[in-house]
From Swiss-Prot:
The gene is rpsD. This is Small ribosomal subunit protein uS4. It comes from Synechococcus sp. (strain CC9902). GO terms for biological process: ribosomal small subunit biogenesis; translation. Keywords: Ribonucleoprotein, Ribosomal protein, RNA-binding, rRNA-binding. GO terms for cellular component: small ribosomal subunit. Pfam families: Ribosomal_S4, S4. Belongs to the universal ribosomal protein uS4 family. Part of the 30S ribosomal subunit. Contacts protein S5. The interaction surface between S4 and S5 is involved in control of translational fidelity. Residues 90-152 form the S4 RNA-binding domain.
């Protein structure tokens, strides 16, 4: 399943607020489609599927990528759900979004893919790069790169930067000092339901 490129508000109407996907708020509170306002009892499977879709769309990952992250989270010590969130939060495109370099995760991915971001002094154009504690991120010393980042920093998608990221706005750089703790994940998600969804599939 490829990455979604369709109308974003259609997704937020169905799944709720997804800060990584779009800044815009849906005007209608019910899901899209002909039967959007109908009240139907959802099955347990449908509820788990919805939570899984929230992760996919908020972090902009494909189904195949998410399966890989679930497998990796299982192999690590501790809670699989928490490990999964930490892996997704550590993606370079998401880190750039949390810092305010990009307006959304898709916008931050574009910033990374176009070579505007460096990690430890080297241009890194892989959005899925796992940012590690001690890594230093910066916007390239190019006029176009700086203008993009400065414009986005003036109107960040999220108001709070998580405490494991230290931002220097003047230098357009930041240092990762640790992993994102569960309480600093901006998405409202029940990660245990996501783990349950994949329990028989992976």
């Amino acid at each position: 399943m490829s990455r979604y490129r369709g109308p974003r508000l259609r997704i937020t109407r169905r799944l709720g607020d997804l800060p990584g996907l779009t800044r815009k708020a849906a005007k209608r509170s019910y899901p899209p489609g002909q039967h959007g306002q109908a009240r139907r009892k959802r099955s347990e499977y449908a509820i788990r599927l919805e939570e899984k879709q929230k992760l996919r769309f908020n972090y902009g990952v494909s189904e195949r990528q998410l399966v890989r992250y679930v497998k990796k989270a299982r192999a690590q010590e501790g809670s699989t759900g928490t490990n999964l969130l930490k892996l997704l939060e550590s993606r370079l495109d998401n880190i750039c979004f949390r810092l305010g370099f990009g307006p959304t995760v898709p916008g931050s991915r574009q910033l990374v893919n176009h070579g505007h971001v460096t990690v430890n002094g080297r241009v890194t154009d892989i959005a899925s790069y796992q940012v590690k504690p001690g890594d230093v991120l910066a916007i390239r010393e190019k006029k176009g790169s700086k203008q993009l980042a400065e414009g986005n920093l003036a109107f960040p998608g999220l108001s709070n930067i998580p405490p494991h990221l230290e931002l220097d706005k003047a230098k357009l750089s930041a240092k990762c000092t640790g992993r994102c703790e569960r309480e600093w994940v901006a998405l409202e998600i029940n990660e245990l339901l996501v783990v349950e969804y994949y329990s028989r599939k992976v």
